[in-house]
Amino acid sequence: MAGEIQDPFSLSFQGNSIHSGSISFGRFEKEGLSWEKRSSFSHNRYLEEVDKCSKPGSVTEMKAHFEAHFKKKGIRFPASLESQTWGVHQTSNEPDDEAVHATESFEDYRSDGSFSEDTSQSNSVCNYSHEQEKCGQGKSQCEFDEESDHCVSYDEILVNSDEVIELDEEEGGGDHGRVADLVECENLGPPEMPQEIVIQDSALVEEAGSKLDEHASKKPSNSMETPSSSVNVKPIIPNDVRVTKASTKGHDVTPKAASRRTKGSSLSSNSKTNVDAKSQKELRPKKTIESQPKSSNKTETRPPIATNRCKTSTTSSKLEMSTGSTSFRFKCSERAEKRKEFYMKLEEKIHAKKTETNQVQAKTQQKAEAEIKQFRKSLNFKATPMPSFYNIGTRPVSHNKTEPSKVAQSRSRPATSASITNRAVTRVSYKHGFEEAEMVKVMVSNRKQSAAKDSDLQKGNLMAVEMKQQIGARRSRN
């Protein structure tokens, strides 16, 4: 029994020692915690691609991979940022057949392959189109919208303008050249035939340049106006025009008419370039040949083509701006008017309260005055001669030497005056009534107060005289 009990205990101890450190909820430190299994959120498959691209050197690997892929497909991979941006800008309402074919093949590759490309790169590659055309005399025409060097923006110049560049080639060899401009367009001619672009009529180049400068200076980038006269301008081909050799393909491919009508259209211009066959012998060993500077270029210009700019779009935008501004101002003015009305109402209320209080005060004053008048009329007071004791004046006290007998006499006089006033009050009360007697009592009390004040003054004067006498006696003794 003891052996049977010890065996499962030892097995459980060994199982715990395998995991070594345990975490709560039945998980262990060495166990792989994949959040995809336990999370309620759906797995985002793009995170894996982000992890791949976040590693250092992944961008260069993808670039090399896609370059090899596009070389196999026969499509030229965009080599510069300018070509990428040109491919993004050159969007059309009617895509070409081979561009659609390129997009389909690229999407098939994305579904099969392990890498995914940015949208900007894929758009720039897919928007690139080329098509084969052959003429009887070996001339190829390429219609495309070209961005001129005079920086005329897409908003300035309007739609319905097509641009034609005719490249005159001589058929002869097996190799083909490639012209790399801001607009990418492949001219695949006979083999080992580098081409030099020769442009005619140098006198007309300056006229076209001056016209373009004046046109760009007169029209700002944001404003759109309809010109009265039609304009036909052929751009000067920039210095960046290069003729390169194609390395792999032996078939002839000429650029198709890629005339596109964009909403913010580019400048309409027609230019013809003639390619001389004499320069072939001189330029065979070179792979890339740069064109001569603008001063040596000769351009053939034609009378200007009509460029239509719509005034309705500008007027509509101006109307929208004006309506927006007027609505905003109208709201502000409404708020200001409401505030003014509110303050006016407050002022009117305050003025009304003030007028009410003033009216109440005036009414109370009028009532008080009327009551006083009525009270005076009810008294029936008549002016009577003053009693004789008011005419009796007190004798002036000598401030010099006075005797105590005189002081005693002056003290006894107010008592006699008080008795006289009492007698006068009694007489008045009998004659004129009770109200007049009260008035006389008030007058008598006032007289008593004045007499008491006079007596106090007399006492003070007497005390001062006594003090002076004492001081004089002391001095005489000394």
UniProtKB/Swiss-Prot annotation:
Its main location: cytoplasm. One of its GO terms (cellular component) is cortical microtubule. The keyword Transmembrane helix does not apply. InterPro entries: TPX2_C, WDL7. Microtubule-associated protein (MAP) that regulates the orientation of interphase cortical microtubules. Expressed in seedlings. GO terms for biological process: response to abscisic acid. Residues 208-217, 278-289 have a biased composition (Basic and acidic residues). The gene is WDL7. It comes from the Eukaryota. Keywords: Cytoplasm, Cytoskeleton, Microtubule. Transmembrane segments: none annotated. The lineage of its organism: Eukaryota, Viridiplantae, Streptophyta, Embryophyta, Tracheophyta. Belongs to the TPX2 family. This is Protein WVD2-like 7.
